[in-house]
């Protein structure tokens, strides 16, 4: 894959130098090269991150999280947005997120406090529990323009899947996620409040309307995430 991307990159440089004006074909080549790079990195990382926790133990350990993430419609106090749905999320991504909160790489005082005392096994167990939930039975209603969002989502498909149900375990499933949470996440990547080189680069050129449309599209997709319901 690295060789393929390298050859394509050399061809692109030669053709682009002969015609300084960017064309639709050039843009398509850039997109393909970027996705090849992302998929190559993802394959390596995914092979090193395999969650293997105990869902039953995770259910008990999730009790502290349930006060926010097991209440349908619950919102963050400030700024106000719905807390993310976690049921059905990739286990490996849950672990990545918890470690980022624990280390302070993702900024959220409550999440940092809750993740701070977790050990590796705790994270594995919580992740296994959350990933065990079945997908939503029906799509959620949204407010934005899902048709426009679908068109704009092509650049997201390499990591997150065309419908937000991607299979690369270290990247989050987006299908069925809270619409306003997705807007908040994209805005934070764009501003640098959340630091991820790939997402920062992808979000940087988005307009407010792009963010609204993308959030609406992924939030509306079937077989999506669910709010955890504890017995």
Place the predicted regions along the sequence by residue:
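Positively charged n-region of N-terminal signal peptides that target proteins for export
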Residues: 3, 27-32
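Sequence/structural segment immediately N-terminal to covalent heme-attachment motifs in c-type
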Residues: 52-75, 141-165, 177-178, 231
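Sec/Tat signal peptide C-region and signal peptidase I cleavage site
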Residues: 47-51
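Bacterial N-terminal signal peptides
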Residues: 35-44
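Short, Lys/Arg-enriched N-terminal segments with co-localized hydrophobic residues
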Residues: 10-27
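His/Cys-centered metal/cofactor-coordination and adjacent catalytic loops
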Residues: 74, 78, 130-140, 175
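Gly/Gly-Pro-rich "capping" loops immediately C-terminal to redox-active cysteine motifs
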Residues: 55, 59, 72-102, 112-117, ...
């Amino acid at each position: 894959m690295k060789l393929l991307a390298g050859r394509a990159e050399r061809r692109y440089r030669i053709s682009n130098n002969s015609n300084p004006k960017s064309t639709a074909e050039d843009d398509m080549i850039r997109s393909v090269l970027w996705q090849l790079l992302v998929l190559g990195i993802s394959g390596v990382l995914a092979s090193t991150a395999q969650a293997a926790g105990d869902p039953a133990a995770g259910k008990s350990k999730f009790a502290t999280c349930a006060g926010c993430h097991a209440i349908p419609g619950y919102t963050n106090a400030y700024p106000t947005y719905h807390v993310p749905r976690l049921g059905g999320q990739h286990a490996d991504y849950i672990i990545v997120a918890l470690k980022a909160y624990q280390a302070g790489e993702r900024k959220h005082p409550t999440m940092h406090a809750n993740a701070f005392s977790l050990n590796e096994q705790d994270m594995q167990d919580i992740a296994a529990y959350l990933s065990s939930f079945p997908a939503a039975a029906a799509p959620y209603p949204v407010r934005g323009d899902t048709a426009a969002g679908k068109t704009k989502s092509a650049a997201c498909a390499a990591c997150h899947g065309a419908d937000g149900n991607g299979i690369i375990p270290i990247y989050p499933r987006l299908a069925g996620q809270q619409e306003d949470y997705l807007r908040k996440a994209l805005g934070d990547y764009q501003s640098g409040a959340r630091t991820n080189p790939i997402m920062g680069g992808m979000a940087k050129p988005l307009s407010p309307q792009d963010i609204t449309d993308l959030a609406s599209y992924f939030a509306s997709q079937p077989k999506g995430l669910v709010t955890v319901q504890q017995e």
